[in-house]
Amino acid sequence: MNINDLNLFAAVAFHGNFTKAAEAMCTVQSNVTARIKNLEEEFGATLFLRTSRKVELTSAGKTLLHYSKQITNLIEEAKLSIGKSDLIKGQLKVGFTETTMALKGPGIVTEMAEKFPLVDLDLTSAMRDKLINDVLNYRLDAAFIPAPVYNEELEHIHIMDERIVAVTPLKFKSLDELLEQPQLKAIVFDEGCFFRARLENWLITHDITNYHKTVMHSIEGVVNFIESGIGFSFLPQDIISTFYHKRKIKTFSLPPEVSAVKTVLIYRKDNLSSPMLKAFISLFSSLKLQ
């Protein structure tokens, strides 16, 4: 067993597929399959459950992934300590909700490029619950999500405060008028969206459970439907003021308990040996993403 074997193992765990892992690691599938088989023989345990569609980690596989991540981080740390160069380099996978990605993603890429030019920053957007799960399972090094965070395996840093507003077509003069609509229509993201959950809970507090939902997969789509008069939604105030302030839509303030959102940066407590993650945390915990 060597570090390359562990890297191939981690790639299969990340992609859930031997072919995709081989492509990502610039090798052939037969090599990946052989290396995984050797690891399973060496540890005397099955590391993956193989199905027709994908492969999933077994309990033993999850344990090995935990240790392989630590080993990889320690090797990178040793290179910095022993090598001639103190430049931090490597890949860092960071996740965002779509709205945070739109607002803060470009700035983060710029800051990292200036401060740590050899760090390959791989950004992805997903729903809050998926981001948490991906960090827990080492598919992401860190993620920006709306608080709160309760998992004991995760550490978090408060990054910024946001405010949610109700976004409606121009014709409405108040939220009361909106709620009086006989066929209320909400424009929302998929299940698992933090803003959708806030909207649904807000409607419940107003005894509204019978309403139509139109699911969109982009901020632009949500705004387009609102502008067309089809329905309303909840979105961060900064998204509207930054990108959509000239659109034919209207925003209304919400009560503090509904509108207040704290964005935090989450990462695994046992992943802090990663030099790239340490650099990322130190940079953005001080900047607070202003």
What feature does the model see in each segment?
Residues K185-H206, S273-L277, I281:
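Secondary-structure junction motif
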